[in-house]
Amino acid sequence: MLLLLLLLLLWGIKGVEGQNPQEVFTLNVERKVVVQEGLCVLVPCNFSYLKKRLTDWTDSDPVHGFWYREGTDRRKDSIVATNNPIRKAVKETRNRFFLLGDPWRNDCSLNIREIRKKDAGLYFFRLERGKTKYNYMWDKMTLVVTALTNTPQILLPETLEAGHPSNLTCSVPWDCGWTAPPIFSWTGTSVSFLSTNTTGSSVLTITPQPQDHGTNLTCQVTLPGTNVSTRMTIRLNVSYAPKNLTVTIYQGADSVSTILKNGSSLPISEGQSLRLICSTDSYPPANLSWSWDNLTLCPSKLSKPGLLELFPVHLKHGGVYTCQAQHALGSQHISLSLSPQSSATLSEMMMGTFVGSGVTALLFLSVCILLLAVRSYRRKPARPAVVAPHPDALKVSVSQNPLVESQADDSSEPLPSILEAAPSSTEEEIHYATLSFHEMKPMNLWGQQDTTTEYSEIKFPQRTAWP
């Protein structure tokens, strides 16, 4: 019986020696591995082997595995990864390539970290145990390195509220245990922030304002091992209450618009139509509604709640129209008064305006002319008054007795000196005299003649000569 077992064992060894090495030494590994630059990858691998001779190895012999890059000189120990403590990997791959599997358990899995573009190439596995040394050249692994396209992830609340602080987290879910942690940086258009970095993530605290709505915020991650960077950009949605509520008015078919303020008053002519557009700045958009006095109005178009079209039939009574903007964070309203006026009223108002303007202009012109005349008169010097004798100026004597004629002889009293002749070069002027008669005495009924003669006083008022 013992002899039979020995014969079977010898026959089995001879059978193994005669087999194809590919049937004795097998390896299962991915033939092509694609990985992005700066990242890491785990390549699963397992192998099998058999004894060719009884003296190849013993159960106590350790099992060593080696990963080589094709084209390297194995005689110079150019190993990329091994579990043999005596032999070390080359400097370029040290602390980046690891034989993660246990060859004792037929595990040859390879772990690669911080992959660089120059790592691309062909790799094969080598087994050493006792006298058995075998290179699995039939089962090579091709490593392809591409550009880094992975981006970080940003976690944030669905909506940010203006004036309230919020936390945002930037992380790299493809973290695979780098020798140095990644470097995080934040950039934003106008937002102010404070960040706190941890291994594999960064927490950002921001207090957004309404002007930050719609702006970009970027988280950038730099991998120190390869110095490659990747970034993620988001658009901020900041919730804020309504502001800058305005009403734009279009009169009739006119394309010219007018922006009205709260409390504005607008006269409306007879037969006129209006289009009122209410708008505000808020996020999410505020609910807009119109009311007339205390009556809520239906919007002209459901798709445009801020649009209100008013036709002459609506405007004949006028009134106060109010636009209300309602929002979860606050509300605003704006009111305007529409005053209908007939065409006659408008014409009278315009005529009154024109007449008033004309009268004002005429009064102003009259005052200006008068001031100019007075100013011109004051500038000319006054000439001395000269009286020229009138050709009909005679010595006159008036008798108190009407029955007695006046005598015009040389014995009469001379005229006052004011009647003296003026120089011939002076222009002749007209003088006026005032005749004053004394109270007449009663007539002598007895025919006696009064020997006393009464004369009248002739007064010439002195006139200033015209220049």
Curated annotation (Swiss-Prot):
Residue ranges of the motif SLAM-like motif: 453-458
Disulfide cysteine pairs (residue numbers): C40-C176, C45-C108, C170-C219, C278-C323
Entry comment describing in which tissues the protein is expressed: Expressed by monocytic/myeloid lineage cells. Found at higher levels in spleen, liver and heart. Found at lower levels in kidney and lung.
PROSITE patterns assigned: IG_LIKE, IG_MHC
Glycosylation sites noted in the Swiss-Prot or TrEMBL record: N46, N167, N197, N216, N227, N237, N244, N262, N287, N294
Localization (cell): Membrane
Residues modified to Phosphotyrosine: Y432, Y455
One CC-aspect GO term: external side of plasma membrane
Pfam family, one: V-set
Domain of life: Eukaryota
Biological-process GO terms, alphabetical: cell adhesion; inflammatory response; negative regulation of inflammatory response; negative regulation of phagocytosis, engulfment; phagocytosis, engulfment
Extracellular side: 19-353
Motif ITIM motif: where in chain: 430-435
PTMs per UniProt: Phosphorylation of Tyr-432 is required for binding to PTPN6 and PTPN11. Phosphorylation of Tyr-455 is involved in binding to PTPN6. Tyr-432 needs to be phosphorylated prior to Tyr-455.
Alphabetical keyword list: Cell adhesion, Disulfide bond, Glycoprotein, Immunoglobulin domain, Lectin, Membrane, Phosphoprotein, Repeat, Signal, Transmembrane, Transmembrane helix
Membrane topology: Single-pass type I membrane protein
SMART domains (UniProt xref): IG, IGc2
Protein name as it appears in the record: Sialic acid-binding Ig-like lectin 12
Lineage: Eukaryota, Metazoa, Chordata, Craniata, Vertebrata
Gene: Siglec12
